[in-house]
A protein has these predicted regions:
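N-terminal ligand-binding lobe of clamshell/alpha-beta domains
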Residues: 1-176
Length: 176
């Protein structure tokens, strides 16, 4: 089965399931061999700019059709059976609607699987859903069990209450 992943976390899941995608997002760099796969999209944003400039570029890109550009020629050449996308954030990765439009425009017979986790449990559920769809349900269950054991081991080593922590997602404008 030919799979394209447009989400770094999905790429990691695929490799954990023993599936090497035929194409990935420009941001997929783990495991290291993912970085050698064809990228089917690129960003219209200058990642070397400061956070205020990036925010301005993102707003302009949204007004001008999106933050990411799909390399339709590469996507067509890869002719995937399945494309893993995301539905969480319009600026974090290629929008689900954009990839569905590209699939339709190119006449590809590819199923788009959308990942939309809002919690760690949702991510683990996505792993199993992906495993079932790609005929790796036993491997997905095993990977999930290993991850849950690691989570439990870490939880057992941490105090019940810890310091209050705020995470700054972005500096300009401030996003907590």
């Amino acid at each position: 089965m030919r799979v394209v992943s447009l989400l770094p976390s999905a790429t990691e899941m695929l490799f954990a399931l023993g599936i090497e995608p035929v194409g990935v997002s420009h941001e997929c760099d783990y495991p290291p061999e993912a970085a050698d796969l064809p990228a089917v999209n690129s960003s219209r944003i200058d990642a070397t700019a400061n956070s205020g400039e990036i925010d301005d570029q993102v707003q302009d890109a949204i007004d001008d059709g999106g933050v990411y550009e799909i390399d339709r020629e590469t996507l067509a050449a890869l002719d995937p059976d399945v494309i893993v996308s995301q539905g969480i954030c319009d600026v974090c990765a290629v929008e689900d609607t954009e990839i569905r439009e590209a699939v339709a425009d190119l006449g590809l017979d590819a199923e788009v699987i959308t990942s939309d986790p809002h919690s760690l449990a949702d991510m683990l559920d996505d792993l199993e859903r992906l495993g079932r769809r790609l005929d790796r349900p036993d491997r997905a269950a095993s990977v999930r069990a290993d991850l849950e054991a690691r989570i439990e081991a870490i939880t057992a080593q941490t105090p019940d209450s810890g310091p209050r922590v705020a995470v700054l997602d972005w500096l300009d404008p401030v996003m907590v």
